[in-house]
Amino acid sequence: MKNHILLILALIFTSCSISTETKVEEKSLEYFQSEVMKPLGLPFSDAVIVDDIIYLAGQVGNLPGTLELAPGGLQAEAKQAIENMKAVLEANGSSLNDVIKVTVMMDDISEWGDFNKEYIKYFTGENKPARSAFGTSGLALGARLEIECIALKRK
């Protein structure tokens, strides 16, 4: 009986001393600020890249390098916001074809149909990104919409 107890204790102590070291793969992390937007001194990055995934900050329909919204209403702002999104993606080795998820925030959700008229010009074909949308108020610069996305980095 003593031998059994000693054997059990030996097994317990031996198993406790075995290293179960888990190696965590180091992730690459990069913060991107476009040269066009840098002079504005905004308190956020245009994108954060973690390994091969790009997380874009929300894009409103501002004209590049300014805090002025594209004139012409919701569709003009939508077009400019998507163009801004496209520029950030392309500067980081990606494209609209690599977008995985889109989130749309709208000042007036009843304008959803007008937004979609512009959106479908950019996201065509069979493989469209997942998308969420919601109505809100108080968007930056008094914008009527803001779009953010997550995309795959190809290059």
Model regions and ranges:
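Sec-dependent signal peptide recognition
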Residues: 2-8
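N-terminal presequence-like segments and the immediate start of the first folded domain
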Residues: 5, 16-80, 87-92, 97, ...
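Repetitive helical segments and hydrophobic/amphipathic motifs
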Residues: 11-12
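Surface-exposed aromatic
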Residues: 100-102
